[in-house]
Amino acid sequence: MANFDLTRINCQFLDRHLTFPLLEFLCGKEIYNQQELLEYILETVNKTNMIDYTMDTRKRLNLSQEMPEELVQRKAEVLATLKQLQNEVAPIMKATDILKNGESMKDSKTFVNALQKDYNFKVEHLESAYKLAKYLYECGNYQESTSYLYFCLIVMSPNDKNYLNVLWGKLAAEILTLNWNTALEDLTRLRDYIDNANFSTIQALQQRTWLIHWSVLVFFNHPKGRDLIIEMFLYKPLYLNAIQTMCPHIMRYLATAVVINRTRRNALKDLIKVIQQESYTYRDPITEFLECLYVNFDFEGARLKLHECQTVILNDFFIVACLNEFVEDARLMIFETFCRIHQCITISMLADKLNMKPNEAECWIVNLIRNARLNAKIDSKLGHVVMGTQPLSPYQQLVEKIDSLSMRSEHLAGLIERKSKQKQNQESADSWKYY
């Protein structure tokens, strides 16, 4: 299934350190040649300061059991630089520890004033803290790096040349330490910055494309992520446009989120539209499963695609944890759609489709109807399942209306903003004609 593997393309939009979990995950699969994969990991890790990881990868490649002199020297240099940076920042960090116990840390301006007044804080100290945070990150010490990055965020002005780098670094470090709540906060902060920054159209598109890929890691690991990924990828026009323009393969993750989110079935209609629009640029078993089921009503095709979906998900680092849930919810979708179209279906036919015994299938269907709150009845004597009409609840109708209006509002806001920028640029260009 290498033709459906997205690791190579996803890694193009991830920080080097964020690619390591994906590459190590692939090492446990039989998709690529293990030797070539380890060589690529070694090539990538050599560009960092993670000397121990480099040595471990060399051992896995049977290159050497002893650390080469070059690596010994490099490790000594890394430790020396780290010590120097820590010494430069130590006085300020000691002051920060003292101030943590007071109320000043809660307010950025008060905190900076206290540092300047009582501890002779200067811009050079901030630069040193930034360098140390970045160096710790390059060494793979992500947890300690987050402390210095947090300090930089409190002290730095959003206009600082390094502010955007700190936002990206903080998000990456929180992802790598699996702090999903904080990672979501950092993701939201970074998205707000990107959406409000004065980037060119190309720069904004690039920033959003990177953010989309990083956010997938957060969304599939955070309890609220399944709703948030739908809101961001499907109902925020700027991000949907970025997906359609730069990374249509992200449709896999959006489709997966909709399938496993039973409370957001109202998003299916909008998702199917986008899948059909992008079908000429990207297709995979997950998007094709939804097309088979909701566009072509090809139930046999959907059943076959579901089998392929299992293989795809099993080999995708981002969504492998959703495998069982995806299969269960996909079966539910097949059942719902099939029964609503045919209205009356024999239990034996469903049992055959589900690879179950008739009595097991009947119990499964009873529980399914009860849990999914479907309007259906089972005639045990005739062995039939009879489906009634399933009206859309007022709540679902309201959610659909809100999503639709929100999407249109954002689209209009984007148009107004672009026209305003064009007008400003035109006025600026015209002003030069007088000189």
From Swiss-Prot:
It comes from the Eukaryota. CDD domains: eIF3E. The keyword Cell membrane does not apply. Disruption phenotype: Homozygous lethal at the first instar larval stage. Larvae are smaller than wild-type and die 3-4 days after hatching. InterPro entries: eIF3e, eIF3e_N, PCI_dom, WH_DNA-bd_sf. Expression levels in females and males are relatively similar 10 days after oviposition, however by day 15 expression is higher in gravid females than in males (at protein level). One of its GO terms (cellular component) is eukaryotic 48S preinitiation complex. PROSITE patterns: PCI. It is found in: Cytoplasm; Microsome; Endoplasmic reticulum. Keywords: Cytoplasm, Endoplasmic reticulum, Initiation factor, Microsome, Protein biosynthesis. Pfam families: eIF3_N (PF09440), PCI (PF01399). GO terms for molecular function: translation initiation factor activity. Residues 219-392 form the PCI domain. One of its GO terms (biological process) is formation of cytoplasmic translation initiation complex. Component of the eukaryotic translation initiation factor 3 (eIF-3) complex. The eIF-3 complex interacts with pix. Interacts with mxt. Component of the eukaryotic translation initiation factor 3 (eIF-3) complex, which is involved in protein synthesis of a specialized repertoire of mRNAs and, together with other initiation factors, stimulates binding of mRNA and methionyl-tRNAi to the 40S ribosome. The eIF-3 complex specifically targets and initiates translation of a subset of mRNAs involved in cell proliferation. In addition to its role in the eIF-3 complex, also functions in protein ubiquitination and degradation. Belongs to the eIF-3 subunit E family. This is Eukaryotic translation initiation factor 3 subunit E. It comes from Drosophila melanogaster. The lineage of its organism: Eukaryota, Metazoa, Ecdysozoa, Arthropoda, Hexapoda. The gene is eIF3e.
